[in-house]
Amino acid sequence: MKCTRETAMVKSLLLLMLGLAILREVAARKNPKAGVPALQKAGNCPPLEDNTVRVDIRIFNQNQGISVPREFQNRSSSPWDYNITRDPHRFPSEIAEAQCRHSGCINAQGQEDSTMNSVAIQQEILVLRREPQGCSNSFRLEKMLLKVGCTCVKPIVHQAA
């Protein structure tokens, strides 16, 4: 009977020591100053490409009946093309940005009219910027000015006095 009581006590002490070791490891991960976890040592982090972020971008209560023409950038009097910008430290990592094809506008005959100006339409958007901290990543919101299309405007004319 004495042997089983000693065995039970040894098991309890081992479980207590294991629990304390786990708590210490968790505390070290939450507070890097308390101790550097093994994963955060240089060279032990997984490659950046293996890290992904999942964001549900479905829009609820959107009107499903309206379809937007896909090639309106070609039918505009100020046509534009899209260029893809890539940044692995940004989410989304790829963003399409408009670039005006001409400095002037296209007239009814399909010719460029240099008496009018083709200018980019800009929209401020929010993106997530990845900030690596050891192996874990945190993200911060960042404003970005994005060219979303082009429009035709009258030029600004300054009169000399």
Curated annotation (Swiss-Prot):
Keyword Secreted: yes
Sites where a glycan is attached: 83
Induction (free text): Induced upon antigen receptor binding in the presence of IL6 and TGB1. Up-regulated by IL23A-IL12B, IL1B and TNF and inhibited by IFNG and IL4 in CD4-positive T cells. Induced upon fungal infection in innate lymphoid cells. Induced in lung epithelial cells upon bacterial and fungal infection. Induced in brown adipose tissue upon cold exposure.
Tissue occurrence: Expressed by T-helper 17 cells (Th17) (at protein level). The expression pattern reflects the differentiation state. In fully differentiated Th17 cells, IL17A-IL17F heterodimers are produced at higher levels than IL17A-IL17A and IL17F-IL17F dimers. Dominantly secreted in intestine. Expressed by resident cells of the lamina propria, both epithelial cells and immune cell subsets including natural killer cells, dendritic cells, macrophages and various T and B cell subsets. Expressed by epithelial cells and innate immune cells in the colon. Expressed in group 3 innate lymphoid cells.
Gene null: resulting phenotype: Mutant mice are born healthy at the expected Mendelian ratio, are fertile, and have no apparent phenotypic abnormalities. They show increased susceptibility to S.aureus upper respiratory infection. Mutant mice are protected from chemically induced colitis, a model of human inflammatory bowel disease.
CC terms in the record's Gene Ontology section: extracellular space
InterPro entries (alphabetical): Cystine-knot_cytokine, IL-17_chr, IL-17_fam
Keywords (A to Z) from UniProt: Adaptive immunity, Cytokine, Disulfide bond, Glycoprotein, Immunity, Inflammatory response, Innate immunity, Secreted, Signal
Broad class of where this protein is predominantly found: secreted
GO molecular function: cytokine activity; cytokine binding; cytokine receptor binding; protein heterodimerization activity; protein homodimerization activity
Disulfide feature: 100-150, 105-152
Signal peptide feature range: 1-28
One GO process term, biological-process aspect: innate immune response
Compartment(s): Secreted
Protein family: Belongs to the IL-17 family.
Function, as annotated: Effector cytokine of innate and adaptive immune system involved in antimicrobial host defense and maintenance of tissue integrity. IL17A-IL17F signals via IL17RA-IL17RC heterodimeric receptor complex, triggering homotypic interaction of IL17RA and IL17RC chains with TRAF3IP2 adapter through SEFIR domains. This leads to downstream TRAF6-mediated activation of NF-kappa-B and MAPkinase pathways ultimately resulting in transcriptional activation of cytokines, chemokines, antimicrobial peptides and matrix metalloproteinases, with potential strong immune inflammation.
Oligomeric and partner information: Homodimer; disulfide-linked. Heterodimer with IL17A (IL17A-IL17F). Forms complexes with IL17RA and IL17RC receptors with 2:1 binding stoichiometry: two receptor chains for one interleukin molecule. IL17F homodimer forms predominantly complexes with IL17RC homodimer, whereas IL17A-IL17F favors complexes with IL17RA-IL17RC. IL17RA and IL17RC chains cannot distinguish between IL17A and IL17F molecules, potentially enabling the formation of topologically distinct complexes.
Name recorded for this polypeptide: Interleukin-17F
Species name: Mus musculus
